[in-house]
């Protein structure tokens, strides 16, 4: 009974801290711009294909397979974690054992996946510590980012080792007490043979130790994740669901500008009621100007660097790093959060996303090729955010590279981006030989 009370208090503390942290993060969504979601069936298909089946991660076949196995393994092992919580609260042992063959299948799968995940994590740590993969580095990747990744991987490694240890000593304890064990544990059964000579007291101690170590590690890890780049453990699946399902090259129009153009072409054209509402600002200049999907993208970013690794601007030495864009949005929102909560959307601390975090040079280096969005394993759309920041610079600040300003002037004066009079547009054909009929 004492153990159950301690467990219940620990669980309550864990849930309380987690709820407080998540509230601090998700309250920021109220300060972002609205964005409607359509075509739910297509979103569900995209979620299954990209998030569950891990389709895009397999563009790097070997490491992609290891990552997918870790993801699928966590889904299977989650069943056992839920069982542990129930056992801890009610003092039971393997409470879901009544499920029979299905329980045996899940336990066997979880046992095998625990070993696979442990090996995969060792490979990931080796790559990070010794192989120096280029995309793991960059000006935006501070030492804390590298330490964060190593810490999270270490958490996962110890979670898997403690799970295997718990199963191993559970089998030994049941065998020594003459009880039939519940479930099937192929890997742990093999490990149990290595400890068969231990005395009963040691076996019971190590079973209890691994059980408590594993569940407490889960509780701690759950509360560390929201402060880590590995927050994508929670955010990646919902992020894929809300991600863009239209073609990546499609540019969303700005409703207010579309309205003005329609009125210029046809003053009697009917307007949507929503288009009549005035807006405070064109584009994005600060973190709370982004729409809620952009903010979810920023929270979900794993900092894996796959986007930056394929960015033609970054490859050719430009300042732009799509990964940095998402990291900056997240960091700026975190910095501004307290003020927004205290004073509302009008809070101004004298800083902004553009200028203090992201330079104009970075924004104009983007070619809008969408390579980053196509490569991102969780469908983050960096170009849409870059485009909105460019819109702010042009429409609100009248700032654009000289080449664009020339094109704008030509469009205004000549109806085309080129510096020729409309009357001269067919001059190129004067010397062509045309057969007359």
Kindly label every feature range from the protein language model.
Residues 270-298, 308, 314-420:
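Ferredoxin-type iron-sulfur electron-transfer modules in oxidoreductases and energy-metabolism complexes
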Residues 65-72, 147-148, 155, 297, ...:
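Short, well-ordered loop/turn elements at secondary-structure boundaries
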Residues 56-66, 83, 286-298, 303, ...:
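Aromatic-capped, Gly/Pro-kinked transmembrane alpha-helices
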Residues 24-28, 215-217, 304-309, 366-370, ...:
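Short acidic (Asp/Glu) and glycine-rich catalytic loops that position anionic groups and cofactors
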Residues 5-6, 21-22, 61-68, 75, ...:
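Peripheral terminal and linker regions in Fe-S/redox and tRNA-modifying enzymes
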Residues 3, 7, 107, 293, ...:
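Short, glycine/acidic-rich beta->alpha junctions
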């Amino acid at each position: 009974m004492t153990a159950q009370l301690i467990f219940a208090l620990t669980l309550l503390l864990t849930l309380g801290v987690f709820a407080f942290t998540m509230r601090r993060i998700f309250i920021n969504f109220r300060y972002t711009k609205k964005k409607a979601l359509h075509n739910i069936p297509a979103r569900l298909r995209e979620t299954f294909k990209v998030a569950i089946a891990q389709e895009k991660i397999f563009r790097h076949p070997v490491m992609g397979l290891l990552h997918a196995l870790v993801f699928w393994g966590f889904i299977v092992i989650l069943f056992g974690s839920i069982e542990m919580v129930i056992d801890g609260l009610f003092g039971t042992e393997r409470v879901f054992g009544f499920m029979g063959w299905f329980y045996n299948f899940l336990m066997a799968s979880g046992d095998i996946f625990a070993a696979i995940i442990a090996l995969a994590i060792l490979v990931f740590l080796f790559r990070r510590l010794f192989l120096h993969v280029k995309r793991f580095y960059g000006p935006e990747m501070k030492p804390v980012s590298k330490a964060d990744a190593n810490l999270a991987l270490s958490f996962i490694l110890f979670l898997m080792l403690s799970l295997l240890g718990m199963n191993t000593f559970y089998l030994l304890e049941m065998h020594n007490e003459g009880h039939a064990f519940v479930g099937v544990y192929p890997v742990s059964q093999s490990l149990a043979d290595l400890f068969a000579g231990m005395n009963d007291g040691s076996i019971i101690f190590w079973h209890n130790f691994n059980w408590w170590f594993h569940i407490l590690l889960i509780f701690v890890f759950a509360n560390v994740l929201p402060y880590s780049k590995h927050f994508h453990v929670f955010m990646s699946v919902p992020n894929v669901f809300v991600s863009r399902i239209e073609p990546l090259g499609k540019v969303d129009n700005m409703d207010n500008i579309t309205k003005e153009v329609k009125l210029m072409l046809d003053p009697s054209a009917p307007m949507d009621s929503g288009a009549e509402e005035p807006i405070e600002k064109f584009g994005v200049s600060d973190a709370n100007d982004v729409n809620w999907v952009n903010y979810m993208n920023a929270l979900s970013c794993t900092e894996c660097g796959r986007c930056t690794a394929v960015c033609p601007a970054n490859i050719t030495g430009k300042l732009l790093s799509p990964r940095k864009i998402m990291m900056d949005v997240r960091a700026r929102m975190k910095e501004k959060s307290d003020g927004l909560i205290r004073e509302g959307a009008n809070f101004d601390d004298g800083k902004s996303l553009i200028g203090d975090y992201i330079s104009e040079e970075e924004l104009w280096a983007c070619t809008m090729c969408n390579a980053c969005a196509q490569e991102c394993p969780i469908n983050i759309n960096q170009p849409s955010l870059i485009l909105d920041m460019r819109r702010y610079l042009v429409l609100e600040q009248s700032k654009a590279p000289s080449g664009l300003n020339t094109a704008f002037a030509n469009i205004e004066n000549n109806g085309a981006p080129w510096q020729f009079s409309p009357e001269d547009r067919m001059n190129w054909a004067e010397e062509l030989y045309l057969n007359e009929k």
